[in-house]
From Swiss-Prot:
Superkingdom of this protein's organism: Bacteria
Record keyword Cell cycle present: no
Protein name as annotated: Putative pterin-4-alpha-carbinolamine dehydratase
CDD domains linked to this entry: PCD_DCoH_subfamily_b (cd00914)
Taxonomic lineage: Bacteria, Pseudomonadati, Acidobacteriota, Terriglobia, Bryobacterales
């Protein structure tokens, strides 16, 4: 099991993921794509990465917008695994 990060560890890790914030105890980001096809394509690629990590996002999609929340339920909060997935998602979004 992974260990929940402290508040100072989270703040330090957020410096490398500036587009992410913490909302309601979860790592949070909103993406905007050109259209629904691009948003859904990203979600498909993201799902493959998440499945490979066995770490699945909470997400909500409307047209070209995608909201993602990451947390590690077993640890009861944000862990390094959430930041690892956030980095993969950012790399996918960057193309």
């Amino acid at each position: 099991m992974t260990t929940k990060l402290s508040e100072s560890e989270i703040q330090s890790a957020l410096r490398e993921r500036s587009a992410w914030t913490v909302v309601n105890g979860k790592l949070h980001r909103e993406y905007k794509f050109a259209d629904f096809i691009h948003a859904f394509g990203f979600m498909t690629c993201a799902a493959l990465s998440a499945e490979a990590m066995n770490h699945h996002p909470e997400w909500f999609n409307v047209y070209n917008r995608l909201t993602i929340d990451l947390t590690t339920h077993d640890a009861g909060g944000i862990t390094a695994k959430d930041f690892q997935l956030a980095a993969k998602l950012d790399a996918l979004a960057a193309g």
